[in-house]
């Protein structure tokens, strides 16, 4: 069986040096605290509603208090989309 020709290697060229790039995080320092606050407010709203048997946080809303709690949680997820 015939042997393959050996290819000649090209001269060595060093890889280009990598330069440090600045990563701009933006001025979104408010996002994480607001997001966590919304999550916790929503969770607390629902827990208080169940623990007090519906008399708190707002008695007139009745079972809509659950929707308000989940609304706060959904708003927290909405704020989380701004996190970079």
From Swiss-Prot:
GO terms classed as biological process: cell division
Signal peptide: none
UniProt xrefs under InterPro entries: CrgA
UniProt keywords, alphabetically: Cell cycle, Cell division, Cell membrane, Membrane, Transmembrane, Transmembrane helix
Membrane-spanning parts: 31-51, 60-80
Membrane topology of this protein: Multi-pass membrane protein
Top-level taxon: Bacteria
Any Pfam family matching the protein: CrgA
Coiled coil: none
GO cellular component, one term: plasma membrane
Compartments in which it is found: Cell membrane
Chief location: membrane
Disruption phenotype: Inactivation of the gene abolishes most sporulation septation in aerial hyphae.
Keyword Iron-sulfur belongs to the record: no
Known role: Involved in cell division. Coordinates growth and cell division. Required for the formation of the sporulation septa.
Assigned protein family: Belongs to the CrgA family.
Protein name (record): Cell division protein CrgA
Organism, as annotated: Streptomyces avermitilis (strain ATCC 31267 / DSM 46492 / JCM 5070 / NBRC 14893 / NCIMB 12804 / NRRL 8165 / MA-4680)
């Amino acid at each position: 069986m015939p042997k393959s020709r050996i290819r000649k290697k090209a001269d060595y060229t060093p890889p280009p040096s990598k330069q440090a790039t600045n990563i701009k995080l933006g001025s979104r320092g408010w996002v994480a605290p607001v997001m966590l606050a919304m999550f916790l407010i929503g969770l607390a709203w629902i827990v208080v509603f169940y623990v007090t048997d519906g008399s708190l946080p707002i008695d007139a809303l009745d079972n809509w208090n659950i929707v308000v709690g989940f609304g706060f949680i959904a708003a927290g997820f909405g704020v989380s989309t701004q996190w970079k």
